[in-house]
């Protein structure tokens, strides 16, 4: 399992990319988007940056996945997502970092 994510198009801002991926992969539109962290997943091998955003004020629409995307959308209560992470059922690094950040800042 993983949170919505994607590659930024040339000239696209990071927030615009986050909004587009959220809409494309989940059908959700955020009233507010706040960058919570930038991290480097593999410093020794690349200069890749990942920008994590907290989306709030969500409204539901229809997802619009790319032709080559195969999505299995599932909504989990936060406590269940924490348990899944602790059991090793969530292994995606950006998702784990995001869940840990949220747990740390929203007790």
Question: What is each PLM-predicted segment?
Answer:
Residues 1-3:
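N-terminal strand-loop-strand
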Residues 5-93:
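Unchanged
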Residues 99:
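C-terminal boundary of histidine-terminating zinc-finger modules
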Residues 104-107:
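Generic C-terminal helix-cap and adjacent flexible tail
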């Amino acid at each position: 399992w993983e949170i919505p994510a994607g590659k930024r198009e040339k000239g696209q801002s990071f927030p615009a990319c986050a909004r587009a991926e959220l809409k494309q992969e989940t059908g959700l539109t955020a009233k507010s988007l706040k960058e919570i962290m930038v991290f480097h997943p593999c410093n020794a091998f690349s200069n890749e940056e990942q920008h994590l955003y907290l989306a709030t004020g969500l409204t539901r629409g229809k997802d619009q996945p790319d032709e080559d995307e195969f999505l299995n959308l599932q909504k989990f209560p936060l406590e269940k997502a924490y348990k899944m992470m602790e059991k090793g059922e969530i292994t995606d690094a950006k998702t784990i970092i995001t869940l840990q950040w949220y747990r740390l800042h929203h007790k």
